[in-house]
């Protein structure tokens, strides 16, 4: 067991939790407090010098946040020696991907997805107040704090790829964001803002429900193709402005086509790039609305006499899909902001409370909601939006909800649901219509689609039933998600964020709708009037570091220079008022810290699932 020492503390390394291209994460025992911590260890060389500056700069900007209320990881301290950098964080339990893996990727109930979504949206809203884009939101970077004591309480981690609005004027290709969660503006080369994180969260929500990534593209063409086949083509003005549009689209040869652009076919892409497109989706959705039909989600709507509990759960799932649709839009300015999303009926439970307050499902949802927000030693208090004082969520009126005591011990917080067998579609063309998202991808003319309008009429003439909600999505992928539970998810080639800045893309400024104070009476009015908090002024700095995710341990750099803390922008590490106590934040809530033991660190400490596992 090795030992490392900072100026103020000493750490015993218990075990290495994981290794990545950037370095490794170890579990350590902090002698001064007796608590277990996570230590991020990177080589001290010129390449990582700049990278570490970026992460430290972002952590410094976040030092005023309460990690418990903002749902971000607590940073303790930074130090270095002649060979390595060390960043010390609180130790958390496991990330959402590992939690899914432990539960055999069973679909997560909508009530638990809401609990996670609420907290991540709160984190994004707080980051936006500091003008910070996380830029790498995914299940691996959302950590469960303590699933036993605080079910589905989560924190956002890994700010190595984060950026500050005022400093990141350009983005380099390849890429920010992990591919499965990459926003359209990054894929197409359009101006972007903090709403790239909202897109990523929408993909995470869908993945928690599906048990499989919504858009698991093997490359950027597949990623764009999947989005087009589910959500339709982007509007022409977006493709006209996109500097990467020609990679995935071509001009439509049909003069009477509704869209002057069409998606390149798989054969076109193969001929141009020698890369064969792959099909990696589990569910081939023809619209985002079909998300609610997966994993038995539409059962309640099909029952002749559904009970109240089934109706409540179905209504909640439908509301969740409506929010996902607002988060997954081609155009970023049409995408819901974090603050407005916190007012959405799915997150606030407004609709569920008004129509299903007496159901057991509502009581379970409310209890899960509360426990995730409970900070030890504090009552759950509503978080207030900075711009207008409107609560993001309001629990005061439900404090006397009936039956909460009995609910506490009657049901587990995670109900492991095995996905029912999907009813395969016999004919993919049964429900084609002009409104179908996937229509027109390959440049069909308007006349080619007119006959599709006759499908309901033909069905009525022949006596066939036309389902109101559309068919279930086609089940496309049959094998296990991991092809063996002992295997870790490996990142496909080119899926990681890259820091070799080239092919610059201009960064858009703060979203126009976020510039005005919110005075709306409803969550929708609040969004249109600017529900997002205006970013605080951030000191301009001269350097912006590249992403931390793509550091290569084997990369050799000529004349490596050692890191000098005083060289950080703003010289905050050397300021007398920026001590360990000023950046460590409040003490971790939960189990009381253990004091130093005479015979070394205690055993049986909570395990920490590395937040640096590979990207999709």
Swiss-Prot record:
GO cellular component: cytoplasm; nucleus
Localization per Swiss-Prot or TrEMBL: Cytoplasm
Main location: cytoplasm
One of the Pfam families matching this protein, by short name: Pkinase
Region (Disordered): 486-616
Domain Protein kinase: 11-347
EC class of the enzyme, as a word: transferase
Chain residues that bind ATP: 17-25, 40
Gene Ontology molecular-function annotations: ATP binding; histone kinase activity; protein serine kinase activity; protein serine/threonine kinase activity; protein tyrosine kinase activity
Post-translational modification: Autophosphorylated.
The protein's role, per its UniProt record: May act as a corepressor of transcription factors (Potential).
Name by which UniProt lists this protein: Homeodomain-interacting protein kinase 4
Organism: Homo sapiens
Organism taxonomic ancestry: Eukaryota, Metazoa, Chordata, Craniata, Vertebrata
Gene name of the record: HIPK4
């Amino acid at each position: 067991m090795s030992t490392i020492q900072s100026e103020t503390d000493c750490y015993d390394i218990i075990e290495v939790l994981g290794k990545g291209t950037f370095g490794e994460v170890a579990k350590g025992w902090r002698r001064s407090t007796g608590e277990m911590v996570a230590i991020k260890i990177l080589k001290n060389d010129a390449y990582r010098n700049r990278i570490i500056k970026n992460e430290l700069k972002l952590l410094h900007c976040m030092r005023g946040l309460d990690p418990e209320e903002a749902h971000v990881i607590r940073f303790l301290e930074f130090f270095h020696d002649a060979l390595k950098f060390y960043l010390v964080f609180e130790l958390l339990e496991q990330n959402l991907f590992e939690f899914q893996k432990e539960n055999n990727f069973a679909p997560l109930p909508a009530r638990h997805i809401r609990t996670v979504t609420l907290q991540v949206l709160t984190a994004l809203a707080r980051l936006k107040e500091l003008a910070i884009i996380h830029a790498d939101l995914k299940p691996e970077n959302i950590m469960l704090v303590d699933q036993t004591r605080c079910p589905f309480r989560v924190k956002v981690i890994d700010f190595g790829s984060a950026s500050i609005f005022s400093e990141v004027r350009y983005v380099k290709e390849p890429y920010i964001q992990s591919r499965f969660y990459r926003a359209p503006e990054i894929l197409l080369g359009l101006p972007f803002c903090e709403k790239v994180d909202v897109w990523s969260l929408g993909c995470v929500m869908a993945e928690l429900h599906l048990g499989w990534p919504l858009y698991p593209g093997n490359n950027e063409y597949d990623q764009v193709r999947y989005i087009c086949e589910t959500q339709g083509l982007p509007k022409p003005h977006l493709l006209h402005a996109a500097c990467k549009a020609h990679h995935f689209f071509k001009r439509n040869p049909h003069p009477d086509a509704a869209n002057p652009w069409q998606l390149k076919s798989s054969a076109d892409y193969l001929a141009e790039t020698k890369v064969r497109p792959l099909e990696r989706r589990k569910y081939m959705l023809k619209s985002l609305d079909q998300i609610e039909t997966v994993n038995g989600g539409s059962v309640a709507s099909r029952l002749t006499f559904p009970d109240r509990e089934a109706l409540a759960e179905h209504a909640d799932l439908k509301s969740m899909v409506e929010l996902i649709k607002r988060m997954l839009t081609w155009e970023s300015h049409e995408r819901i902001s974090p603050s407005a999303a916190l007012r959405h009926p799915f997150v606030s439970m407004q609709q569920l409370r008004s129509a299903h307050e007496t159901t057991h499902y509502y009581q379970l949802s409310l209890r899960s909601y509360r426990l995730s927000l409970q900070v030890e030693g504090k009552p759950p208090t509503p978080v207030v939006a900075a711009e207008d004082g409107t609560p993001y969520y309001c629990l005061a009126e439900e404090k006397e909800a009936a039956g909460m005591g009995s609910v506490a011990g009657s049901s587990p917080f995670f109900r492991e649901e095995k996905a029912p067998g999907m009813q395969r579609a016999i004919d993919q063309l049964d429900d084609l219509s002009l409104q179908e998202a996937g229509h027109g991808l390959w440049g069909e003319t308007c006349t080619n689609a007119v006959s599709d309008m006759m499908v309901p009429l033909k069905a009525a003439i022949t006596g066939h039933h036309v389902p109101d909600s559309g068919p279930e999505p086609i089940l496309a992928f049959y094998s296990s998600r991991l092809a063996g539970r002992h295997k870790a998810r490996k990142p496909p080639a080119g899926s990681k964020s890259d820091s070799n800045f080239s092919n610059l893309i201009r960064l858009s400024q703060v979203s126009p709708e976020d510039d005005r104070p919110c005075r709306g009476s409803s969550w929708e009015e609040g969004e249109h009037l600017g529900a997002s908090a205006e970013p605080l002024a951030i000191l301009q700095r001269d350097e912006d570091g590249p992403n931390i995710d793509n550091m290569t341990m084997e990369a050799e750099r000529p004349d490596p220079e050692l890191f000098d803390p005083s060289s950080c922008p703003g010289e905050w590490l050397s300021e007398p008022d920026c001590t360990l106590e000023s950046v460590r934040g409040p003490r971790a809530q939960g189990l009381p810290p253990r004091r130093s033991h005479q015979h070394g660190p205690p055993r049986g400490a909570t395990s920490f699932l590395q937040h640096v596992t590979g990207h999709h």
